[in-house]
Amino acid sequence: MLAQATYGYDHQSKTALTDLIGMLLGSVSLQDVQMHTPCVNPPLKATVKRLISEVICRYGVPETIESDRGPHFNGEENNLTVDTNFFLLGFQLSHQLNIFLFCLLLVVYCGTICGNLLIIVLVSTSKSLHTPMYFFLTQLSISDILLPTDIIPNTLYILLNNGASITFICCMNQFYFFAASEEFECFLLTVMSYDRYVAICNPLHYNYIMTSDHCIRMAAMCWVLGFSITLMYCVTISLLTFCGPNIIDHFFCDLVPLIELACSSTLTIELEAYITCFLVLVIPIIIVIISYINIIVTILRFQSNVSRQKAFSTCSSHLIVVSIFYITLLSVYLYPKGGKSLKVNKLLSLLYTVFTPLMNPIIYSLRNSDIKKSLQEFIKKCVICQNGINNL
């Protein structure tokens, strides 16, 4: 609104605007953000900085301010770019709630690492689990270790400091591994649905179709697609101009908060986002739905109740994981912004970045007799080894 009001201003108005911007820049320094000093009113400062950015991006930097921009700015002519730092606001909670959330996330992170490592160890050491379904489960566990490791440590730091600055490179690294893990999981869950479809609907050809080489190629393709598609995002984001204020009202570097800070055109990256959404979300969801429709129809044709229960038990865990993952993901990125607050958005993001990786090994362990049996055998082996060491 400030930019529109000053459209076509004359020399006198320009001088007054210059003085106004000078006073605002003096009172709302970007050093307040970059040096971790607490903001008296962060939303107000963010609004003021955004208004300043709109004016400067549209009309250029006034001459009286040009000489005083200091080391925090670079760029030429009409571009004002904050050098390298962003500021993550986090959850903006009271000190007591921050401590509680810190402890909760720390426990969840430790449980996530231990649970997924246990799945990987069990599948690797138990011959009865050397099947395509459990091979894909180990790949899911690797992704579930990578994602929270990328998000939680920095989130814990933000909770302790009530916000934290992050360099552009670190922000891009965090976004890269976050998005790559999510996209990989979208593709992998689709492959796992196909695996269950072949096992239930075409069991006689299962061993011929789902060979070890075929499984390795499909898993590798999921990793390659996830990391290569995300690289395209990072390249496009690096070409954007950020006029400031570079304040991200989130607990990690996500795509939407990042492009909202850009003062240059975001048409290219928005187009990439729509195309990627179709390739990574829409198509996999359609494949998963079609696969499970065929699976359910096939299972209902079984005459034996025992066969039905066994078939449902092998698919139910995967179906629960798929449902939780896609529901939380779609609620964050496809649900209209006007229908939910920033706090709700952060909560939903917390679910699929932190709690879903914890739930996956629990769901597969509690509802899978093969993993339970392998866990019992693994514990017996550990006890025998410990007794042997003690007897030496």
Name each model-derived stretch.
Residues 1-77:
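Retroviral integrase
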Residues 76-392:
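Transmembrane helical core of 7TM receptor-like proteins
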